[in-house]
Amino acid sequence: AVRYLYDLGHRQIARVGGPESLAHSYIRDSAFADVASELGMRYRCLHTDYTPETGSEATKRLLSFPEHPTAIIYDNDVMALAGLGVAASQGIKVPEEISIMSWDDSFMCTAAYPNLTAMGRDVVDTGKQAAGLLLKLIDGERVGHLMEGPYELRARASTGPAPAEEKMR
């Protein structure tokens, strides 16, 4: 996701994640920071509780900075939709002035306007893996962890080339 935004010309990005105490938040934060640093991008990470309210608050905070990010990646579709709403309420055009991406890729991504670019995965396969682990637990077996991913970038209308410097707020 970070490389995709870099390839679109974005150099200042942000991530709105879930609680820092969750393992997948830590993993995503680390991967985000590592790739952004490797590419020489400026970045910020804010953490929320996954609700639309905190997604909105985080978006407002990010957009209040004099040099706000030109792209934001949200940890779920609910917060990304809230981010779209904040951008619209502030007259910021998506994707012309800011690109917005999500994790999860639920049906909400294609119902939103503009359609949300998202990182998605095969939920049926993930469900099968989870069911298999549950059956092993029921049988008294020790089980490992359900691994997240692999994810696939599903590019849609909410991401585009970074705005020219003079267009940035």
Please provide the spans of the model-predicted regions.
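Bacterial carbohydrate/catabolite-sensing allosteric modules
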Residues: A1-R169
